[in-house]
Structures are given as C-alpha cells and as structure tokens.
C-alpha cells in the first residue's frame, strides 16, 4: 500500500514548501530517537518515515511524480527509501543544533553507512625563484636545487619487498578506521585514515629494505626551469612529477617567480619605461639618438621643441607578451640637461637668440 506522505507530515496536498519544511522540523524534533529511550525502535521507524516524506515532498520533481503516480523512484533502491537517498542534511543539521548543539549531521549519517572519503595528501611542492627584469625580457633557464620524497626505485612506491602486499589487518582493507562514540540510535561516528596502512588498505608482507616500507626515499633534485619571455611577478610555473611522492602517486613542483625591480627600467604591464638625457640643443632643434635597453640598442627621433619630461614611444620594443605574439612598447622619458657652465660667447649667443637683456645676466651665473 502506497504511503500518504502528506498525512505523515500532517499537511494539506496544496501545502507550500515553507509549510512542508516547518512540519518536518517540528516532527523531527518530536520523534528524534534519543528523546524516546523508552520506545527507541518505534521512534527510529517514525523518524525515518518522516524523513522519507520530507525527501519526497521537498523535491519538486519527486513530489510531482508522487502526485501523479502515488509512488517515487529512489534510484538504486527502487521504491524503498534508505538513508543514502536523503539529501537534505543541512535541514537536519539545523534541527540537531537546536536539540543538541554543535554540528552533528555528517556524523549522524555515518551511523547509517555514509562513510567519509579517504584522507587526501597534498603532494605538490612550492618554491620561490628570484629573477631580474632582464631575465623576464629575454627569457632564460634557471637551475633549482631542493629535496623531496621520491618514489622508491626498488619497490616502485609499494613499500614491499618484491612488491607483495597483504590486506591491512587493522582496517580489513578499507583504508579507514571508524571510531564510534555514544550509544543507541544517535551515534557519533568519526572516520579517519587508517594509521597502519595510511589509507591504502594494504601493507607490505615484507618491508622494502631500501625505504623501510614507506615507499619513498629522500632525493636531492637539481633541475632546470625554463623562464618564458614576458614572465610576470607571482607567475607560477608547473614542473610535472617533481613534487612529493606517496602511495604510488607523485605531485608537481610549482615555481613562483619573483621579478626584482630594475633601477633603470620601470615595467608598466608590458610597456617598459626608461629615462633618457638630452641636451638643450637636441630638445630645441631635434635630433636622432641611440637609446639602450638591456642588451638592445634602438634609434629614437627627438622632435623639435621636445619638452622636459615628455614621453616618446618606440613601438614593439617593450616586454614580450607572455605566451603570445608581439611586445609592449618602450617609453622614453626625456630629461633635458641644462649646462651648469657656459662660456661668455655661449651666454651671449643665448641672450641674442632669446632676446634677453643685459639686466638678466644673473640667469646665467
């Protein structure tokens, strides 16, 4: 006989989602098994029935199927509900917090066979590498020396002599240990990685003499890392398979670049800026000069009437675009040098050019 989920929760067939949730919360608090030690079995059945009804009526698709056919498909379980079908853990967690305090939902369902995943280890390594702006401009290769746990070459990371493994007697091959606290229906179950086998479920029948059963050996690495043109500060370079090894797996090495500032060159995204001195005549009359950037030389035209602090641009002479084509621009900020000492003839010529009267002689002393 089909169950009447609306009757179980005590709501009308046109009940809103909020009304269904409210009814479930009240009934779940009322029938929690640990609150009924005198008739715990009845409370367990009632609590499960309430949860089943809520699972169906709080899900639009399941509720629509139930309203149309009077039945619900719970997946692998068919029409039979079990705790693996329940998906509203956050709602139960709120209820448990009201009753007991703390975060109990995940531990509560562990008592019904919902185990936790095997503990995962971060096998990746990270290291910083300082480079110059010139290194980033041209691209280069740098050597890095470090130590890591590598897979034992004698046992291929199994930790077993001759590679022979047996089932772990502590966890019976599950890779996990379950610690149960409390009694009765409401049990606190903590699932941890097995300390004997490290979560593998198997242990060496006889330990590898080289690695003493760990599956790894410490090695000193000396590797070359390619720095791409256009490298930026905090850029992460991945060196595959050069991280830590554990349980037959090996992580990666991540090299984090630190691009040092250059006293003569300023980076603005992919544009580079330098300061260039020119004399008064070049600024006034114009000229073509040579500017230097690292190991490169570029020709730059100084227009007539160039002002101090004016920025001139050499297209495509800046920082190469990272992982792309082309480059930024080279920005040349012009600094006009004013001579500190002039001959009398030079002073007279300047006065004549700018029609400066004799009473302004102090300008040139």
From Swiss-Prot:
<keyword id="KW-0862">Zinc</keyword>
<feature type="repeat" description="CXXCXGXG motif">
    <location>
        <begin position="168"/>
        <end position="175"/>
    </location>
</feature>
<keyword id="KW-0479">Metal-binding</keyword>
<feature type="zinc finger region" description="CR-type">
    <location>
        <begin position="139"/>
        <end position="220"/>
    </location>
</feature>
<dbReference type="InterPro" id="IPR012724">
    <property type="entry name" value="DnaJ"/>
</dbReference>
<dbReference type="GO" id="GO:0006260">
    <property type="term" value="P:DNA replication"/>
</dbReference>
<protein>
    <recommendedName>
        <fullName>Chaperone protein DnaJ</fullName>
    </recommendedName>
</protein>
<dbReference type="InterPro" id="IPR036410">
    <property type="entry name" value="HSP_DnaJ_Cys-rich_dom_sf"/>
</dbReference>
<dbReference type="Pfam" id="PF00226">
    <property type="entry name" value="DnaJ"/>
</dbReference>
<keyword id="KW-0963">Cytoplasm</keyword>
<dbReference type="GO" id="GO:0031072">
    <property type="term" value="F:heat shock protein binding"/>
</dbReference>
<dbReference type="InterPro" id="IPR008971">
    <property type="entry name" value="HSP40/DnaJ_pept-bd"/>
</dbReference>
<feature type="binding site">
    <location>
        <position position="211"/>
    </location>
    <ligand>
        <name>Zn(2+) 1</name>
    </ligand>
</feature>
<feature type="binding site">
    <location>
        <position position="208"/>
    </location>
    <ligand>
        <name>Zn(2+) 1</name>
    </ligand>
</feature>
<keyword id="KW-0235">DNA replication</keyword>
<feature type="repeat" description="CXXCXGXG motif">
    <location>
        <begin position="194"/>
        <end position="201"/>
    </location>
</feature>
<dbReference type="GO" id="GO:0051085">
    <property type="term" value="P:chaperone cofactor-dependent protein refolding"/>
</dbReference>
<dbReference type="GO" id="GO:0008270">
    <property type="term" value="F:zinc ion binding"/>
</dbReference>
<feature type="domain" description="J">
    <location>
        <begin position="4"/>
        <end position="70"/>
    </location>
</feature>
<keyword id="KW-0863">Zinc-finger</keyword>
<dbReference type="InterPro" id="IPR036869">
    <property type="entry name" value="J_dom_sf"/>
</dbReference>
<dbReference type="InterPro" id="IPR001305">
    <property type="entry name" value="HSP_DnaJ_Cys-rich_dom"/>
</dbReference>
<dbReference type="InterPro" id="IPR001623">
    <property type="entry name" value="DnaJ_domain"/>
</dbReference>
<dbReference type="GO" id="GO:0051082">
    <property type="term" value="F:unfolded protein binding"/>
</dbReference>
<dbReference type="InterPro" id="IPR002939">
    <property type="entry name" value="DnaJ_C"/>
</dbReference>
<feature type="binding site">
    <location>
        <position position="171"/>
    </location>
    <ligand>
        <name>Zn(2+) 2</name>
    </ligand>
</feature>
<dbReference type="GO" id="GO:0042026">
    <property type="term" value="P:protein refolding"/>
</dbReference>
<feature type="binding site">
    <location>
        <position position="168"/>
    </location>
    <ligand>
        <name>Zn(2+) 2</name>
    </ligand>
</feature>
<keyword id="KW-0677">Repeat</keyword>
<dbReference type="GO" id="GO:0005737">
    <property type="term" value="C:cytoplasm"/>
</dbReference>
<feature type="repeat" description="CXXCXGXG motif">
    <location>
        <begin position="152"/>
        <end position="159"/>
    </location>
</feature>
<feature type="repeat" description="CXXCXGXG motif">
    <location>
        <begin position="208"/>
        <end position="215"/>
    </location>
</feature>
<dbReference type="Pfam" id="PF00684">
    <property type="entry name" value="DnaJ_CXXCXGXG"/>
</dbReference>
<dbReference type="GO" id="GO:0009408">
    <property type="term" value="P:response to heat"/>
</dbReference>
<dbReference type="Pfam" id="PF01556">
    <property type="entry name" value="DnaJ_C"/>
</dbReference>
<dbReference type="GO" id="GO:0005524">
    <property type="term" value="F:ATP binding"/>
</dbReference>
<comment type="similarity">
    <text>Belongs to the DnaJ family.</text>
</comment>
<keyword id="KW-0143">Chaperone</keyword>
<comment type="function">
    <text>Participates actively in the response to hyperosmotic and heat shock by preventing the aggregation of stress-denatured proteins and by disaggregating proteins, also in an autonomous, DnaK-independent fashion. Unfolded proteins bind initially to DnaJ; upon interaction with the DnaJ-bound protein, DnaK hydrolyzes its bound ATP, resulting in the formation of a stable complex. GrpE releases ADP from DnaK; ATP binding to DnaK triggers the release of the substrate protein, thus completing the reaction cycle.</text>
</comment>
<dbReference type="InterPro" id="IPR018253">
    <property type="entry name" value="DnaJ_domain_CS"/>
</dbReference>
<keyword id="KW-0346">Stress response</keyword>
<feature type="binding site">
    <location>
        <position position="152"/>
    </location>
    <ligand>
        <name>Zn(2+) 1</name>
    </ligand>
</feature>
